[in-house]
Amino acid sequence: MGKKVTGACKENKVTEPVKRVYAFGKDAQGNNVTEGNTTMKATLGGKGANLAEMANIGLPVPPGFTISCQTCMEYANAGNVWPEGVLDTIHKYRLDLENRIGKKIGDAEDPLLVSVRSGAPMSMPGMMDTVLNLGLNDESINGLIRQTENPRFAWDSYRRFIQMFSNVVMGLDGDLFENAINAMKAVRGVKSDTDLTAEDLQELVAEFKGIFTENVSGEEYPALVVDGSVQFPQDPMVQLKLAIEAVFGSWNNPRAVLYRKKNKISDDLGTAVNVQCMVFGNKGNTSATGVAFTRNPANGAKEFYGDYLVNAQGEDVVAGIRNTSPIAELKHVEGLEEAGRELEEIFVLLEYHFHDMMDIEFTIEQGKLFMLQTRVGKRTAAAALHIAIDMEKEGLIDKKEAVRRVAPDQLDQLLHPQFDKNADYDVLARGLNASPGAAVGEAVFSSADAVAAAEAGRKCVLVRWETNPDDLAGMIAAEGILTSHGGKTSHAAVIARGMGAPCVCGVEALKIDAEKKQATVAGTDVVIKEGDMISLDGTSGIVVLGAVDLVMPELTGDLDTILEWADGFRKLGVRANADNPEDAKLSRDFGASGIGLCRTEHMFLGERKQIIQTFILNDDEAVREKAVGELFEAQTGDFYGMFKEMDGLPVIVRLLDPPLHEFLESPRALDVEIARLEATGGDKTLIAEKRMLMERIDGFAEQNPMLGLRGCRLGIVYPILPEMQVRAIATATAKLKKEGLDPKPEIMIPLVSTVAELEKLRAVAKKIIAEVAAEEGVELDIEVGTMIELPRAAVTADEIATQADFFSFGTNDLTQTTFGFSRDDVEAEFVPQYLQEHLLPYNPFATIDPGVAKLVEMGVKLGHEGNPDLVCGVCGEHGGDPDSIHTFNKIGLDYVSCSPYRVPVARLAAAQAALEEE
């Protein structure tokens, strides 16, 4: 059935006259009567504004008029009711257009045909609807035949119009019409639409009108009922009204809504509607249509790029019905030479005028060129870099504009493997694009199996309900991580981004049975078994059954050039979050000016986990001291490697932060193990030991561990732990100083809420640093600061700053504690619904929330009151988010810190933030 479109037109009272319709193009005397320009995108949409601009600079643009974006929103917000007077205004502009052209829409002698196209303020290619050849009916078809002396062209145009109108405006399934065309070709024994004769197409028109009558409801569209049955509308004004309503309605079609959400485009902008005289590329071999770019959008090369078709309409180029020809050949085609040369001249003119690479749609009608659209062309990351640099060299833009031209998030394309764009695959499921890049490997369902697969030389993808610290070895071994639970700041997402591993999280359709080592996908009969090849794309969040070919983007000097320019403009420093020398080196290679967060808890995993468990679970002080001694030796080596790799640059080491239960066995897993032993008649002594261990672990259980015994509280209750860590930091520093290096460690105390907590632990740290300095005979100047990740810490930052050399805002936990959210739960449970219902504008764990940002701003201001020399940074996941970086720049932070692979992104975003404030 067709989609709902208001039948009878109701009027909405408006007191103030508002201009809602704008003309573009020339009048009958050749004078430009355009009422807009390229600066009016918010009103005319991108397409309408640029049509007006092309008309203003004298390019051959078919005339027409544009209905404003605001009219679309008024119409939608009033429940699909037209604002008062708008239909009368449209009628006036339609009459004006007819006078300018000297033809009338629907005229039986010499009909004017128009297109009705969408055009939002922000480019949304292919997301909304278009209707072509509007104005054809059973009378005007005869006029078109007489004027063109080409019956086949006329009937083909009418056929196309009915098909497009039925699909776009009435919502009928396009296959109804394609099936009829295919049946006709089969009967005629031909393969291509172009092989059908005028008589065939006339027969199809009659059949198409029958399909329309059978599938459109007279109850929904009473105005279309004639003699008791629905008929294809013959009144051009009815056609036009319904088409405009359909384009307005397409603003809220599912694909457009999804596109806006993905690209952070407001839902309140609306789309303009462009009503434009049709020109035809299917009037014979001196007619053509095409789409082109003024430069190569794939690699940025300065060459004309695109395709055209002779004797075709615009949708044929993108529909793939016929093989296209490269745009460079157009000027060599007989009958099209002059138009081809003129087009290339226009390419140069458009670049000179807009100072950017432009995307163009054109039609040549019997040798005469017409420009149907121009807009800033979409391009790959590699092309964006190359074009920006070339245009700076050519004098079209300066270095500042070149830096502005590259979208920071685009750089992900250059740093990670991607699905081959030519690969053929079907999407099995979708989740959150948690960590960019693509991975292919056999599915494994446990960390141990991932390690085993990697050791055997087999690539694998770790598939889990959600990951935890126990899975680290498997995450490192796997090519990528796939989880059915968790959000963009879940354990899997954070660790994957830090490692530069592709990750797709929160695939709700994925039902994982870890014991059976398989997963099913809701809504399908697919079962993913251990060893099955799967592919995932962490950039887009898609999962594919089978192996998809991957490609690694080629890095060029263009990236270094743009980032070097960016560094000259940015105010924010950019550091990295790294926990090992390998990541530290990568961070430095990517241009990080230090390490903003070294998480020491990651150093307690793997083989060392048994040591920390011994400390936690054993009451014997001698045993515990021995365990701490082993940890000291291990940590000293860790810090030595980190500080050496970052020689001369700051490394902020966060003392142990997580609750102790994270280092212990899972009670659930232990309970399952005990049940298995009992069911299989296992060793009773072993069962008893497991039960004792269970009781001991239960003693560390907390109702809300993330707000319990962790961070600085852990250091106060178990002082031996921070003492050991500080001593290891100081010892590693002293050793490197003796070797002639310049280590610059800084100690960060986490989860402080009162100045008393920080004062106590700072005193402990300074005492141990002094002891090590005396023992080693070197001078140690190690700063001590804190993380501001609790609201109380932010609002008492002036007090806390008296005991701190620096603040690092932990915006992950600050967001949790400000909202009262449990991050790992809410991202999967209700944040998606909140986003859908506009209760949240975006995920606050991905982009900093204004309320949380106010706490950061307050913390910075108060902190400087307490300590004017205080250095302030941010080390949460927001540190790599371009939108958040703009906020942090305004607040006046000194640096942001992010995962190594986000460092180039942050450098560019920081420069753009600084330029935005100029």
For each feature predicted by the language model, list its residue ranges.
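Nucleotide/phosphate-binding sheet-loop regions of phosphoryl- and nucleotidyl-transfer enzymes
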Residues: 2-426, 458-461, 468-473, 479, ...
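Protease-associated
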Residues: 3, 396-477, 542-550, 559, ...
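Short, ordered loop/turn segments at secondary-structure junctions
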Residues: 66, 70-72, 467, 486-488, ...
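Conserved alpha/beta-domain cores
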Residues: 117-118, 555-558, 565-918
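A short, small-residue-rich loop immediately preceding and capping a beta-strand
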Residues: 479-485, 503, 873
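Conserved nucleotide-binding/hydrolysis modules and their immediate coupling elements
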Residues: 492, 508-512, 517-522
